[in-house]
Amino acid sequence: MQTVAEMIPDYKQNLDALRARRRELIAERELESRFERRHALTVRIIRLDGIIASTTAALHDMIAYAD
């Protein structure tokens, strides 16, 4: 079992990957001409925004706890 301090790098790496995926989806949405596909991409982006926000908050708390 990992300590909180040991988990922080993994959370940071996952957060970077989530942000990169969000950028990819935004770029894909900008090029998409079909409304239905743009809408589906927007829904995915909104879901990712929530995941990114909760992961960021968790990471902040983990860093504070580890100090």
Regions found by a protein language model. Give the residues of each.
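Short, charge/polar-rich alpha-helical segments
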Residues: 1-20
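Amphipathic alpha-helical coiled-coil segments
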Residues: 44-67
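N-terminal regions of proteins, emphasizing targeting and processing segments when present
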Residues: 8, 12, 30, 50, ...
